[in-house]
């Protein structure tokens, strides 16, 4: 007859209960593929809620829960094909931060003139149609003019835009001027985009630029997001970019890589799917070095009038394919 196990002492029972409730389950616990202790979800949630003063949040809850924000000295790459919404994703993140926190932001934009960037940020923040705003200003509409002027003196006084192609030394000088202007250190910086930084545009040059920006963000002690063009061999426009999609690389330097793409470019879509995806945009966490290394692909509504990116509502789906034309 097999020998029965000895009863546990009260001390042994307490020790086992403490071990089971601990977030550190030791080396003897299997490495599960599909489950993890619920305590990790609460840990992630608490960190997400409490890190307002630490890490910069992008304002997309699913992405923020995966990345848990961007800390000082960390670099994020936002990768995708041209005109696929990469910059727009970060513009929305900037506006969310300006509206909901006391964030001060430095934007390096050698790709677009600062006037155009300012217009896009205003339309996102105030839900304005870009064409209508331009027409109001042309017509001398006082309400529209006052809205723009008031926003520039208040909300948008916490963002500074430089549209030159600056060296790393010049970027540091710009940072010092921003610190002097605000009397404080900025919370976040954006570069749009990597390939337009001074230097060679071949593989060696692009990697050197990525390494230089990473080094700059650490020395400047600032969270940095960098727009990075997808290479020609990175796949179809309507599919998520892989981790190596960035033109000539550079992804090794980043804490995380976000792939931005639009399913509207898929030639196999049905008519109904074309209508739906004519206003959709996908943000994919392609790589994430922050434990527990969560990834994911998240779909949002991209307003064709204001440039706002947010979750879908029922009335967001167009009745026809007007935005595909």
Residue ranges and their predicted role:
Residues 6, 11-22, 32-39, 127, ...:
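C-terminal regions of RecA-like/P-loop NTPase motor modules
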Residues 19, 23-128:
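The Walker A/P-loop phosphate-binding site
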Residues 65, 101-185, 297-299:
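Cytosolic-facing regulatory segments adjacent to core modules
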Residues 68-70, 99-101, 151-154, 180-183, ...:
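Conserved catalytic network of the ASCE P-loop NTPase/AAA+ motor domain
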Residues 84-86, 113-117, 168, 196-200, ...:
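Flexible loop/turn segments at secondary-structure boundaries
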Residues 93, 116-121, 174, 212, ...:
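Alpha-helical scaffold elements adjacent to nucleotide-binding pockets in ATP/GTP-utilizing enzyme cores
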Residues 107, 190-191, 222-229:
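Structural recognition of the conserved hydrophobic beta-strand(s) that form the central parallel beta-sheet
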Residues 158-219:
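Phosphate-binding/switch loop-helix module in NTP-utilizing enzymes
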């Amino acid at each position: 007859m097999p020998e029965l196990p000895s009863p546990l002492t009260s001390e042994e029972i307490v020790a086992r209960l403490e071990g089971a409730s601990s977030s550190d389950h030791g080396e003897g616990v299997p490495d599960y593929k599909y489950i993890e202790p619920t305590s990790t979800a609460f840990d992630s949630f608490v960190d997400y809620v409490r890190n307002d003063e630490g890490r910069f949040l992008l304002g997309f809850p699913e992405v923020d829960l995966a990345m848990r924000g961007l800390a000082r000295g960390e670099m994020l790459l936002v990768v995708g094909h041209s005109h696929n919404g990469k910059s727009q994703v970060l513009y929305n993140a900037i506006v969310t931060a300006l509206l909901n926190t006391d964030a001060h932001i430095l934007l390096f934009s050698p790709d677009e003139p600062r006037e155009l960037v300012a217009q896009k940020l205003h339309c996102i923040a105030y839900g304005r149609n870009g064409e209508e705003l331009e027409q109001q200003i042309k017509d001398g509409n006082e309400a529209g003019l006052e809205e723009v002027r008031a926003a520039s003196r208040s909300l948008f006084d916490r963002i500074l835009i430089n549209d030159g192609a600056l060296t790393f030394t010049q970027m540091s000088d710009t940072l010092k001027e921003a610190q002097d202007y605000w009397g404080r250190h900025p919370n976040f910086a954006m570069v749009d985009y990597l390939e337009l930084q001074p230097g060679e545009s071949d593989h060696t040059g692009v990697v050197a630029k990525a390494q230089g920006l990473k080094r700059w963000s650490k020395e400047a002690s600032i969270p940095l997001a960098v727009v990075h063009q997808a290479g020609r061999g990175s796949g179809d426009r309507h599919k998520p970019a892989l981790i190596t999609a960035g033109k000539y690389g550079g992804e090794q330097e980043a804490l995380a890589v976000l792939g931005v793409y639009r399913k509207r470019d898929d030639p196999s879509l049905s008519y109904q799917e074309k209508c739906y995806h004519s206003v959709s945009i996908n943000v994919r966490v392609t790589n994430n070095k922050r434990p527990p290394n969560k990834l994911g692909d998240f779909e949002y509504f991209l307003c064709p009038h204001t440039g706002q990116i947010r979750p879908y509502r029922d009335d967001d789906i167009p009745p026809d394919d007007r935005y595909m034309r």
